[in-house]
């Protein structure tokens, strides 16, 4: 089973401080995560949502702002003694703006996760793995973030990525966007935006250009797109399929 991180390839882009302008997985909420993992995923989302519904009158709840898609938040913690898919936990699902912010406000920031942990946000029905049918023919825009920026830029870049997803900021090509992953690693962290059609150059390029602009990355910095099929081959000379 392939992991949702991509690392160590020669063509990956490293964002440095001067370059930044600005079904096996088990369903579990934060309260359902096993005791050994709880320190990496605090807070009870179910409890918070129940509390919100108790405290807000029906007329307020009726004014919730629906999202175009229903989204699923996943949490991964690397444990080599377990199968890869058994390390993947479904945290929660949401389909309104208000629930998105409730989720984001009650989980750890990406920068606070332990090394070897991931967050993934994907459209409902798409698993955060290469083998999923919606991902097989796709690829990802990959951003590698210098570890010195973890506590300065990682959370901003990840939040902006999430807002791009739930806000459908990729216009007509939002349908080709599957989700995004943030990998917390010892040397460099990574953020990847996954799309479904690696051969759709027009769509991939439009998504990449909008994404780069939304992240506030310098025009002098090149970010690359890699097809999942190429990444799965684990080539030491993996070349970017597209760049912006």
Swiss-Prot record:
Q: Which stretches are tagged as biased composition: Basic and acidic residues?
A: 1-26
Does the record's keyword annotation contain Protein biosynthesis? Answer: yes
**GO molecular-function term, one example from the UniProt record:** RNA binding
InterPro entries found in the cross-reference section: TIF_eIF4e-like, TIF_eIF_4E, TIF_eIF_4E_CS
From the UniProt entry, list the residue stretches annotated as the region Disordered. 1-57
Listed A to Z, the keywords are: Initiation factor, Protein biosynthesis, RNA-binding
Sorted alphabetically, the Gene Ontology cellular component annotations on this record are: cytoplasm
Annotated residues that bind mRNA are located at: 84-85, 130-131, 185-190, 233-235
Q: Looking at the record, which segments are called EIF4EBP1/2/3 binding?
A: 65-68, 101-105, 160-167
Question: Gene3D superfamilies, per this entry?
Answer: RNA Cap, Translation Initiation Factor Eif4e (3.30.760.10)
Q: What does this protein do?
A: Recognizes and binds the 7-methylguanosine-containing mRNA cap during an early step in the initiation of protein synthesis and facilitates ribosome binding by inducing the unwinding of the mRNAs secondary structures.
Task: Tell me its family.
Answer: Belongs to the eukaryotic initiation factor 4E family.
State the oligomer form and interacting partners: EIF4F is a multi-subunit complex, the composition of which varies with external and internal environmental conditions. It is composed of at least EIF4A, EIF4E and EIF4G.
What's the name of the protein?
Eukaryotic translation initiation factor 4E type 1B
């Amino acid at each position: 089973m392939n992991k949702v991180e991509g690392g160590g390839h020669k063509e990956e882009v490293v964002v440095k401080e001067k370059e930044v302008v600005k079904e096996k997985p088990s369903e579990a909420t934060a309260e359902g995560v096993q005791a050994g993992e709880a320190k990496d995923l605090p807070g009870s989302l179910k409890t918070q949502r129940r509390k919100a519904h108790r405290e807000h009158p029906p007329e307020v709840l009726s004014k919730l702002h629906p999202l175009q898609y229903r989204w699923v938040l996943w949490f991964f913690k690397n444990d080599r003694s377990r199968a890869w898919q058994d390390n993947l936990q479904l945290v929660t699902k949401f389909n309104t703006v208000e629930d998105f912010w409730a989720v984001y406000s009650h989980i750890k920031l990406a920068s606070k996760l332990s090394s070897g942990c991931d967050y993934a946000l994907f459209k409902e029905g798409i698993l955060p793995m290469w083998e999923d049918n919606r991902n097989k023919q796709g690829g990802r825009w990959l951003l590698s973030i210098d570890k010195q920026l973890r506590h300065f830029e990682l959370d901003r870049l990840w939040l902006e990525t999430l807002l791009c997803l739930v806000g459908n900021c990729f216009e007509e090509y939002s349908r080709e966007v599957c989700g995004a992953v943030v990998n917390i690693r010892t040397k460099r962290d990574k953020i990847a935006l996954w799309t479904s059609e690696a051969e759709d150059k027009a769509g991939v390029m439009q998504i990449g250009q909008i994404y780069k602009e939304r992240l506030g990355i310098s025009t002098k910095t090149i970010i690359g797109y890699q097809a999942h099929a190429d990444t799965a081959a684990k080539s030491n000379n993996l070349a970017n399929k597209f760049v912006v």
